[in-house]
Amino acid sequence: NVSLSGGGDSGSYFVSAGYYNNDGVSYGNTFDRYSFRVNTQGKKGWFSFGENLAYSLTNTDPNQTNTYNDFLRMMPTIPIYDENNPGGYGYGDAAKYNTFGVNPIAREDLEYRHFRQNRLNGSLWLEFKPFEFLSYKFNGGIDLYFYENSWFRGEGNWTQNQEHRDPESQKARDNTYNMLIEHTLNFNKD
């Protein structure tokens, strides 16, 4: 994380940028976030103004299964990889290892999900105060959100008696925005 700030009698600023990464404690799970923020404000005569802008980008690759439960349900004698099975991963069979536990390594390798989120929040204000008893203020704000969910399932199995499925892929997107525009006139004379 890096930040820079400063100012004087007529204004001030603050700028920051950050990066966060977490690979998780279980196989196949990551999180990355990039963030940027800038705030400024100033005053000149009858006018004062300011803005606040924040942007973030997050990338998430979550686990596809409950890895801990799957490790407990799989017998320790079942190999992770087995070239005789579709996809090349080991899992139970009725003759030797009759379990319907999920091979968590196979599940993470064969099924992939990725979330990407962009978010921009900002506000801007301007105030005009020609007299102590009279002021006008404009306030504007915006919240933009862009979301993408990608999913891919490769060919192969991760548990016994699983039906064959051809590879498939899905992608979903969502874009939303909210805006605020506000005008305020204040009169306060005793």
Enumerate the language-model features and the residues they cover:
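Outer-membrane beta-barrel strand-turn architecture
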Residues: 7-10, 43-46, 128-134, 189-190
